Amino acid sequence: MSIRRIEVKNFKSFKELKIDLGKFNVIIGANASGKSNFVHIFEFLRDITSSGLDNAISMQGGREYLRNMNIGASEPLSIKVVSDQEFGLLGRTKVGLIGIKTYEATYEFALRFNKRGSGFRIVKDELSQKCKFLKLERKGRKIKEKEIPGEGEILISRSNGRVKIVLNIPPNVPLKKEVIFPPFLQEEKLPEHKLLLETPYFPPPLESIFSEISIHDFDPKLPKKATPITGKAELEGNGNNLSIILKNITENREKRRKLFNLVKDLLPFVENLDVEKFADKSLLFKLKESYFKTQYLPASLISDGTINMTALIVALYFEKKPFVIIEEPERNIHPSLISKVVEMMKDVSQTQKKQIVVTTHNPEFVKYAGLENILLVSRNEAGFSTISRPADKEEVKTFLKNDIGIEELYIQNLLEV
């Protein structure tokens, strides 16, 4: 799993949020409750890694719309992420190789905005890595691992505009910070508006947690149009380059077989999928239905639901990013297929090493999601968004014991009791 816990303060409609995430997470709530703002947290983190902090703030509408409007500049905006992503480092010492196995990482930063103007400063920027240590011995072609008793922590932080590195390790581990971080990287001056997340101090396995967040809000009208062949090789958030992705998939025999089997399971009338290339170097995907065995239907004539289902399958099974957010995946899909869509997502979260977050208004989706996977977003009397787990509420458990379905409680707005 990538992200185990997230905490935010003074971010959009949230005053304070602390929430644990599982492998499969279904976000529900009334209109304007804050579901999209929850998604914006991950979007903001991703944009920092790809475009830098200043641009990421601007892409959220600037400081005025990034922070909570009621709180404003009176409190810092902060985000804290806890990850249980495991990864390893090697350190060469006088006694041989020492393996460093990180099993938990916590990254936190806070921004304090000026009361006037658009200025801000970074008041906290800290990465903590909890780790175990291994002594590595080479025996022939094999490397033997022996765990060294005790655990440690690698702490990287911003202090007076410079990088500060602290190594808290057991005395029996012969490791110095110079082995992990070259001297020229220690106490280096950091640019004023640049987070550790944007620097080489952030280990690539951790940085990829944020940079490889994919957010999808599919618009079935866009894939119905011809796509220039020069588009991205990964699925866009709105799905407009679906034809390019399908072309790449169908050119590989094994991937083509897998795609067809997945589509056929949800849409039995589909006989084949293909992509047509035009003289103007554009692509348009097409499919053949069992009702018309000799004729393909172009994307422009394919139903919105069929396109949505195809895009969902591609995002879940063929895209490599480990953290996937899909907004309202049930749109244009018949209620009888919702249970299969939910099971598909659960399967991917368990077997494909992907963490999935879904937002929905659909009672059928809520019905099959599983109570333990549901997160309810609501607004309190002060207008701040809060997130709770209905599974933790005794009143909800009582309703369920009396054979009232979770979807009925959702429709009647009883999950907030």
Could you say what each language-model-derived stretch is?
Residues 1-15:
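N-terminal pre-Walker A segment at the start of P-loop NTPase domains
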Residues 12, 25, 43, 330-331, ...:
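Catalytic acidic motif of RecA-like/P-loop NTPases
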Residues 16-22, 315-318:
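Phosphate-binding P-loop
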Residues 23-60, 304, 309-315:
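Phosphate-binding glycine-rich loops of NTP-binding sites
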Residues 40-121, 134, 141:
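Conserved P-loop NTP-binding catalytic core
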Residues 97-261:
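Electropositive, glycine-dotted interaction segments
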Residues 237, 241, 261-318, 323-336:
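Conserved ABC ATPase signature
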Residues 340-417:
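C-terminal lobe/lid and adjacent interdomain/linker elements of RecA-like ASCE P-loop ATPase modules
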